[in-house]
Regions:
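Conserved donor NDP-sugar-binding/catalytic core segment of glycosyltransferases
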Residues: 97-120
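A conserved acidic beta->alpha catalytic loop
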Residues: 36-45, 89
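Conserved donor nucleotide-binding strand/loop of the catalytic core
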Residues: 44-77
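Short beta-strand-to-loop acidic/aromatic patch adjacent to the donor-nucleotide binding site
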Residues: 79-90
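Acidic helix N-cap motif at the loop->helix transition within catalytic regions
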Residues: 17-21, 41-50, 94
Length: 207
């Protein structure tokens, strides 16, 4: 399987303690692009030392803005597929192989991860809409796989600060075929570095 066709995209903010190990593990399966969201620590340096392609935001752009830059970088480098992952180790990099098989060998354009943990109330509310309309179990899981043609059709990854869901939901609305696979990893114990405010998703709930 040609690894030059696929990139792992990781947005990172103040993740110096974990990003190096995440990148090293992920690079076993694909090239890694890390976008450092103007972190005040050594996040970018740790990612670069581990072998990632690193770009840095001069100002803090947040989760969606940072992933926008990651998708732009991947497209500019000619990658045909992308897998998004978190920088904190919540997603097991070994799962990349399962995503690659679906994206490349089985030509599934959209692959959605499903977390095993219990979801918060607001996540359940958001998830209920997406589950009922599209049959998606966990739209807020940060590990997703995309054919880059979906990003081109959407004009990028995000325009609405959607907590990482706009591209997936808009693709689903277009009737894009998808598959779901369980994802595992280590759930972080402290607060998420990116402020993923769930109320932002309400912009996507209008049919």
């Amino acid at each position: 399987m040609d690894r030059s066709r696929i990139a792992i995209l990781i947005p990172a903010f103040r993740e110096a303690a974990t990003i190096g190990a995440v990148v090293k593990a992920a690079r076993e399966y694909a090239d890694v692009i890390v976008v450092d969201d103007a972190s005040p620590d050594e996040t970018g340096a740790e990612a670069a030392n581990a072998g990632a392609i690193v770009i840095r935001n001069e100002t803090n752009l947040g989760y969606d803005g940072t992933l926008n830059r990651a998708f732009e970088e991947a497209l500019s480098r000619g990658f045909a597929f992308a897998i998004t992952m978190d920088a904190d180790g919540e997603h097991n990099p070994a799962l990349v192989n399962a995503f690659k098989v679906l994206l490349i060998e089985e030509a599934v354009p959209l692959v959605l991860g499903v977390r095993p943990r219990k979801q918060r109330f607001a996540e359940i509310v958001m998830g209920l809409y997406v589950r009922l309309r599209f049959g998606v179990k966990d739209i807020l899981c940060g590990m997703k796989g995309y054919d880059m043609k979906l990003a081109l059709a959407n004009g990028g990854f995000d325009h609405t600060n959607s907590i990482g869901t706009e591209l997936a939901i808009n693709s689903l609305r277009r009737g894009t075929p998808f598959r779901q696979i369980p994802v595992s990893g280590t759930q972080r114990q402290d607060a998420p570095r990116f402020d993923r405010r769930l109320r932002a998703n309400m912009r996507l709930l209008v049919a």
